């Protein structure tokens, strides 16, 4: 709580003046003396009353300079001295912090705060009785209110005391971190307190629309409250999809979700004409044309255009299958594979071919099937010019040119370029083993 006392005294012309506390206004020769702006000397003292909390008391003394009897002009110069001291103290006050600040006029002394960027918290409300106020010893505690966006940041002066040198940081944010109490920014909705205004700004999103009545008196209680809520308070999702009922926190996320239902794909590839619903998907797709594959597998050296593609590939080496089907308990390494499997339980085939009426669970499967009707083969081998309707068939064909045979037989060690070739080869071993087992059975009889 700031207590402000203002006292006016007239200086004696015969007393010695401190050069830092007074100034003389020269007059030009031959010109009549014009009314000069009055120079005021203001002394602000912060004192500590005798009760539990440290509440500074500010005394203000305005001393007019001799020879300046004209009324105050708009360009008046104020010299402010801020001095902190404790009442009833036996010290001589040499240890008190003192600083001098010079302003053009009182109306413009808050110009720095008024010119702050909107993204920074601005001083929205302060003690209106501060300039030239009377004794405010009996006034209630002052809560400085800072605004940022639609939220309010309340700085409780009873818990956090701001000195004259720390009221504003170098970045323009109001810093009231002086004091022993860790909680200084209080949510106006639920009463929760935070040490930094950025933490409160994040909390306001979580607190919106929820009747939260928790309050903290220290940092440990705040940490326990955060731990009980999983570290993050529930966030409001006011934007609801009218088609499927899914909710989102941001309106932009809802608009992107609507494209799933409408089929809108505004982002088109200039190379192949393929369209995408999001720009990030188009950027990843463009790497297939440029050949930019920055993500490399440390096991086999295979390269990928996205980090997610590399993570999915790494599961083939580790054997991790984190996605389980709730119907049959079967595990899958990829989420899209699980979705395709779940459609087999549902029996849903929403994508129907207009040529033959065949249904498919995925839209991509329908596109691949339609190429059998149109005869389109967009995937062309760069070595021999042979074309294919599916990219997987092109990859299998390119292994003939590269000589790569990653699939080996566990019985004889023979290698194959494609997995289907290995399966056909393994049937030979199965027939031989079956014939040998029959011969052994006949011989035993």
UniProtKB/Swiss-Prot annotation:
GO molecular function annotations of the record: DNA-binding transcription activator activity, RNA polymerase II-specific; RNA binding; RNA polymerase II cis-regulatory region sequence-specific DNA binding; zinc ion binding
One annotated Gene Ontology cellular component of this protein: nucleus
Span list, region Disordered: 1-38
UniProt entry keywords in alphabetical sequence: Metal-binding, Phosphoprotein, Repeat, RNA-binding, Zinc, Zinc-finger
Keyword Iron: no
Example GO BP: regulation of transcription by RNA polymerase II
C2H2-type zinc-finger residues: 185-210, 239-261, 267-289, 295-317, 323-345, 351-373, 379-401, 407-429
Annotated positions of the Phosphoserine modification: 89
Superkingdom as given in the UniProt entry: Eukaryota
Role, per record: Binds to RNA homomers.
Protein name: Gastrula zinc finger protein 5-1
Species this protein is from: Xenopus laevis (African clawed frog)
């Amino acid at each position: 709580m700031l207590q402000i006392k203002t006292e006016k005294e007239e200086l004696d012309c015969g007393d010695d003046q401190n050069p830092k506390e007074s100034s003389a206004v020269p007059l030009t020769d031959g010109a009549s003396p014009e009314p000069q702006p009055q120079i005021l000397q203001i002394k602000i003292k912060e004192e500590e009353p005798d009760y539990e909390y440290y509440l500074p008391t500010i005394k203000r003394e305005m001393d007019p300079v001799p020879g300046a009897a004209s009324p105050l002009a708009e360009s008046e110069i104020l010299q402010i001295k801020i001095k902190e001291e404790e009442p009833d103290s036996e010290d001589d006050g040499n240890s008190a912090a003192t600083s001098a600040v010079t302003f053009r006029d009182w109306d413009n002394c808050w110009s720095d705060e008024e010119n702050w960027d909107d993204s920074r918290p601005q001083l929205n409300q302060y003690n209106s009785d501060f300039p030239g106020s009377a004794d405010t010893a009996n006034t209630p505690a002052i809560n400085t209110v800072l605004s940022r966006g639609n939220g309010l940041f309340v700085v409780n002066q009873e818990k956090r005391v701001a000195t004259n040198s720390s009221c504003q940081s170098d970045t323009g944010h109001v810093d009231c971190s002086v004091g022993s109490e860790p909680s200084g920014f209080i949510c106006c909705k639920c009463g929760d307190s935070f040490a930094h205004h950025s933490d409160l700004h994040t909390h306001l999103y979580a607190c919106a629309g929820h009747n939260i009545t928790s309050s903290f008196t220290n940092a440990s209680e705040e940490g326990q409250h955060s731990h009980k809520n999983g570290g993050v308070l529930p966030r409001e999702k006011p934007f609801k999809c009218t088609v499927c009922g899914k909710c989102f926190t941001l309106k932009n996320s809802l608009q992107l979700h609507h494209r799933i239902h409408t089929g809108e794909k505004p982002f088109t590839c200039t190379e192949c004409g393929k369209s995408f619903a999001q720009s990030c998907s188009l950027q990843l797709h463009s790497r297939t044309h440029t050949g930019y594959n920055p993500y490399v597998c440390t096991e086999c050296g295979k390269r990928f255009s996205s980090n997610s593609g590399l993570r999915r590939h790494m599961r083939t080496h580790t054997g991790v299958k984190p996605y389980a089907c709730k119907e049959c308990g079967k595990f899958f390494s990829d989420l899209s594979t699980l979705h395709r499997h779940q459609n087999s339980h549902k029996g849903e085939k929403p994508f129907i071919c207009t040529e033959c009426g065949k249904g498919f669970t995925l839209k991509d499967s329908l596109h691949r099937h339609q190429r059998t009707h149109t005869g389109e083969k967009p995937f062309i081998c760069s070595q021999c010019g042979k074309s294919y309707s599916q990219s997987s068939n092109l990859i299998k064909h390119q292994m003939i040119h590269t000589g790569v045979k990653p699939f080996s037989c566990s019985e004889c060690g023979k290698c194959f370029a494609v997995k289907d070739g290995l399966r056909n080869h393994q049937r030979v071993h199965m027939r031989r083993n079956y014939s040998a087992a029959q011969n052994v059975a006949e011989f035993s009889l």
